[in-house]
């Protein structure tokens, strides 16, 4: 049996941090497996028996994008922390740190545009990763400010569903006019 991350985490002598990203995309069997790890810091493997955390149990972080509901049993074994989208100031500082070459006015307009988009009824709201990707794209295109044509041409960077792109395309002129002020 080749040790995978869960088994390695339990065997780590000095303890460790285990990140299980996007748990909502895992199947129910994996969720069930996690119940034993999170409650008893052990895993039962029919071929080799029960493996317990050696000295210090791992610190486990689970992330979810809420694509499906996770089980109540798993929720009971976790502390819940909701991280909302950043406000304008924080998002601006994140963009400045991750895309330092972005012109200040473009950064202001981009962040405001994203904040406005998040108020719309979209299938998937743009996350900070999409904002960063869009900022990098606009810098590569030598944009100095958000022009409606460029916004329409690059909406696929921030919106992941064609329906959202089509809906927002009709709003681009109004949104860019609003943030130009």
Question: What is the role of each PLM region?
Answer:
Residues 1-181:
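C-terminal regulatory/interaction module of P-loop NTP-utilizing enzymes
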């Amino acid at each position: 049996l080749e040790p995978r991350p869960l088994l390695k985490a339990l065997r780590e002598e000095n303890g460790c941090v285990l990140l299980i990203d996007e748990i909502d995309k895992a199947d129910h069997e994996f969720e069930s497996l996690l119940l034993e790890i999170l409650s008893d810091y052990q895993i039962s493997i029919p071929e080799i028996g029960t493996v317990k955390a050696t000295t210090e149990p791992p610190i486990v972080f689970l992330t979810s994008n809420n694509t499906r509901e996770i089980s109540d049993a798993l929720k009971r074994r976790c502390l819940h922390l909701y991280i909302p989208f950043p406000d304008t100031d924080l998002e601006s500082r994140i963009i400045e740190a991750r895309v330092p070459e972005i012109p200040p006015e473009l950064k202001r307009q981009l962040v405001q545009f994203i904040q406005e988009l998040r108020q719309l009824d979209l299938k998937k709201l743009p996350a900070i990763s999409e904002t960063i990707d869009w900022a990098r794209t606009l810098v590569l295109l030598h944009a100095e400010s958000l022009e409606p044509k460029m916004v329409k041409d690059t909406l696929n960077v921030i919106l992941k569903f064609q329906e959202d792109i089509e809906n927002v395309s009709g709003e681009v002129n109004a949104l860019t006019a609003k943030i130009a002020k």
